Amino acid sequence: MKIVITGTNGFIGKNLLNELKDSNEILEINEDIFNVEDWYNEIYYKLNKFDPQVVFHVGACSDTLETDVNYMMTRNFEFTRRVAEWCQLLGRKFIYSSSAANYGTNDEYPSNLYGWSKYTAEQYVVKCGGVALRYFNVYGPLEDQKGKMASVAYQMLEKQKHGQEIKLFPKKPQRDFVYIKDVISANIFAMENYHENMGQWYEVGSGDERTFEDVLDILEIPYTYHDEKDIPKGYQFYTKSNPMNWMTEWKPQYNLENGLKDYLKHI
């Protein structure tokens, strides 16, 4: 099968590429596409020349602290819009990597530019008949290039490696930590069951809310706590996927304990 994957230099895209490359013909599209002045026509040229049956659109600016509106919307909305329209026009499968950042701090509206860019793109994808997957807190192998956007598990392991003190917020934030292998299985499930799920968004998570303390206790990493006054304004203290919003018949296979155990084999 001929498949396009965007963002294969990134964490999720690289894992998806590794899963699919041995049995499919893959075209990779990455950030360097924006080095071309007429980048949107360059995208159409690549898509038309390769003529894929499936497009996994994983690539995006994932920096939740980015404040440049033009930069963010070009990469996260305009790029998505053009690929979604191409897939709709030619009847190709389009699977979009969305985000739980769509929910913001009150489950209603995104609370930052990244969240808004992903939310607006997701709404367009659904309108075009694609499948959007809202990932929660993804962790796993190959996330080292994410820097400050890497998972809590990766960042804490790095701090331990370099002998740095680890401090947590005293209010005990809870997150839905989802292992990368479950994210990849959700993408493949969406591809294989596309027509039943097209024109919809779905959540991809473990379905469990766990604390940062849980992560560190499983990894056997010691920690202390910040003062209450150190908590950033607007900090999100709770996320959890709802199994009612998962794709029918798709289920995660890893809880936090099993996911971290498998993760440690790759570090």
Predicted regions: what is each one?
Residues 3-20:
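N-terminal Rossmann NAD(P)H-binding glycine-rich loop of SDR-like oxidoreductase domains
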Residues 9, 61-63, 99-104, 136-142:
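Active-site segment of SDR-like NAD(P)-dependent oxidoreductases
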Residues 57, 81-113, 131:
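Conserved Rossmann-fold NAD(P)-dependent oxidoreductase catalytic core, especially the SDR/UDP-sugar
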Residues 71-82, 112, 116-117:
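Glycine-rich NAD(P)-binding loop of the Rossmann-fold in SDR/ketoreductase-type enzymes
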Residues 113-115, 119, 123-175, 180-184, ...:
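NAD(P)-dependent short-chain dehydrogenase/reductase
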